C-alpha cells in the first residue's frame, strides 16, 4: 500500500466489497466520494434524483451499457456529513456470488469509481473528522475481536472513552504550555504569569493520569489478544490431558509413553468472555537423546519466554523432586502457576503444606515477591479427569490478573498508544524536574512540548505518512 496521504486521490470516488469475500447469502459493496450518486444511479436507475439519507431502496441493478439485469439489490443512501466516511455513501446489498460482486465492481470502475485501498474508508472518516485516530484503530480491533471482552473494549474505544480521557490530559497540557509561553513573552517586563507551585500541581495531575493509563496496557492487551498459556513440566505428567481438558477438545495425543509430545500444540478457547490460547510443549528432560525430542524441548523453552502465563505441571504422586525444582527455578515467578496433577491417584487430597515445605529452600521460593499470596492463589491441585478443573483454574486466573470489567474503566490495548503515552509520561516527569530546578519557562516549554506532541500523535492531531501507514496497513479492503 502506498502512502495514505495522497492529495487529489482523496477526492476520488472509491468502491469495494465490505463483507468477507467468498460465497454467501448477501454481500455489501460500499461506494464513497463526491460522485457516488452520479455513478451508482447509472446502474441503479430505480434511485430517485434526490434520495433520502439512511433510506433503503429496492430494484434491479443493470449493466449501464446494455441494460441487462445483473441482480436484484438494496441500495442504502447516506448523505454527505451523515455517513461513516463523512462523504456521500451508497451501500449496495447484492446476492453473495463472487461473480455478481465482481461484475458490479467492474461496472462502478468503468463509470469512474476507483477500487479502494486497504482501510481507505476508515481513513477518510478520520480525515473528515468523523473519527480520531484512536477511534479509527478501534474499528480494526472490533473487526478482529475474538472474545466478548475484546469486542467490549474496542466498542468503548470506538465510542470515544479513551479519546475523551486523552483530551482531558491534552487540555491540561495546553494550559501549561500557554502559561509557559506567556511567561517567556513577559519575562523582560518582570511579570510572573503563574506561580511555579501551580504548574507543579498541574504537572502532577497529568503525570497521575498518564501513569494510570500506561499501567492498564497489560490488562488491555490481555483483553484484546487473550492470555497465552504454556503448559510445561517433565514428560508424562499429564500436560496433554490438561490441554484437552482446558480446550474441551481432544487436541493432543495422550499416552503413557514419555516424550509423546514432540512439537508445540496450540489451541484457543474462551472463558467468561476472555480468549485463552493454550500451548502444550514437549516434556523437559536432560536425558533426551532423540533429535526430534531435543528440538521439541528447545521449542518448549521458546514458548515459555513468549507466554503470558506458564502452568508448571507435575505428578503429585511423584512429588517435587530435583528435576521438577530445576525446571521451576528456570521460570519467571511473576507468570508461573503450579498445577499438581493426578490428584485422583491419591484420593483427591490437597497437601498444600507439603508443596510449600518442599519449595521453601528453593531458588524459586526466594524469587517470589509474596510467597503467602503465591501459595494461596497460584497452586492448584487438579485432575485431568475432573471437568470442574477448567472453570476453577481459569476463574482464579482471570480474577488475579485483573477484574476484567471494561464497562467503567478506560484501558489502552494498542502498542502504539502505549509507546506514545510512555513517551508523554517521561517528558512530563522531566518537565517536573525542570520546574523543581528553577530552569525557567523556556526549558519547560521545550521539554513539555514533546509530551503534547505524543498526545497529538496518539489522537491523530499530528501525523505523517509513516504514522498513517502503520495504522491503516492492517485494515482489509472495504473498511
Swiss-Prot record:
**Keyword set for this entry?**
Cytoplasm, GTP-binding, Hydrolase, Magnesium, Metal-binding, Nucleotide-binding, Potassium, tRNA processing
Which InterPro entries has this protein been placed in? G_TrmE, GTP-bd, GTP-bd_TrmE_N, GTPase_MnmE, MnmE_dom2, MnmE_helical, P-loop_NTPase, Small_GTP-bd
KW Transmembrane helix (keyword) present: no
Give its E.C. classification number.
Answer: 3.6.-.-
On cofactor binding, the record's note says:
Binds 1 potassium ion per subunit.
Enzyme class, first EC level, given as a word: hydrolase
Q: Please list the GO terms describing molecular function.
A: GTP binding; GTPase activity; metal ion binding
Q: List, separated by semicolons, the cofactors it needs.
A: K(+)
Q: Which residues form a coiled coil?
A: none
* Record GO biological process: tRNA methylation; tRNA wobble uridine modification
Q: Chief localization class? A: cytoplasm
Task: Summarize where K(+) binds, as residue positions.
Answer: 236, 255, 257, 260
- List ligand-binding residues for Mg(2+): 240, 261
A cellular component term from Gene Ontology for this protein is: cytosol
So where does (6S)-5-formyl-5,6,7,8-tetrahydrofolate get bound? 30, 91, 130, 479
Q: Where does GTP bind?
A: 236-241, 255-261, 280-283
Q: Any idea where the TrmE-type G domain is?
A: 226-402
Extract the CDD domains matched here. Answer: trmE (cd04164), TrmE_N (cd14858)
Oligomer and partners = Homodimer. Heterotetramer of two MnmE and two MnmG subunits.
Q: What does this protein do?
A: Exhibits a very high intrinsic GTPase hydrolysis rate. Involved in the addition of a carboxymethylaminomethyl (cmnm) group at the wobble position (U34) of certain tRNAs, forming tRNA-cmnm(5)s(2)U34.
Question: What family, per the record?
Answer: Belongs to the TRAFAC class TrmE-Era-EngA-EngB-Septin-like GTPase superfamily. TrmE GTPase family.
Q: What is this protein called?
A: tRNA modification GTPase MnmE
- The scientific name of the source species is Bdellovibrio bacteriovorus (strain ATCC 15356 / DSM 50701 / NCIMB 9529 / HD100)
- Tell me what gene encodes this: mnmE
